[in-house]
Amino acid sequence: AIAGSLSNFFALKENEFVPNPKFIPSYKQEERNYIEAANILKDSGVDLLILEMLLDINHSEILLNAALKTGLPVWVGLSCCESKFDNSIVGRNFRAEKEKSLIYDEEKYKEQPKFLPEDEIIQFEDIIKTLTNIGGDVYGIMHTWFQDSSGGLKIIKDHWKGPMMYYPEIHKFDTSTHEAIAMSTEDEFANSCLEFIDDQIQIIGGCCGVSDTHLKKLIEKF
């Protein structure tokens, strides 16, 4: 099967991990953009749509509704982290991460990195409740470190009884060198993934830092 990818990741400022205000559309234009992109993928012959790295409610529900309009199966991938402020599970947010996933010079870049323009810290359970009430065929966690994943997967299971997927992230990114720093070996990746596979979580992949050798090792051990 061929999957088409859709995301609500915004264009960034040059050399910074901050959405560029010049390219942030209105919600109405954002909706039109998603519908156009989803239909292009459908017309190109994809078998399903995967929504990647959803972090919030407002942008995510617009994207999910646009994807569902195509009539294709929609897999909903979310990203979360355990908040350093109160240990709750929230939509992934650079401010809330206990361990920084982005390495950057704080003297050079004064503005705090952020994924979305609003930079809200949102309870992950609120995101899941909203999106599962809209629809989708598969739900899961992606672009999330192993140590943050278990809480997010549990919340999804509390509100979703359908099939689930899991695509962990295993690297940090150094903005000064533009290099990814792998945080897990192939064996560590495979062993950690195996801990999450169960009757509901059967679709396993990898996000940033995961290579074909990581996935081959997982297949060997499965």
Where are these regions (language model features)?
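Domain-level signal for soluble alpha/beta catalytic cores
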Residues: 1-222
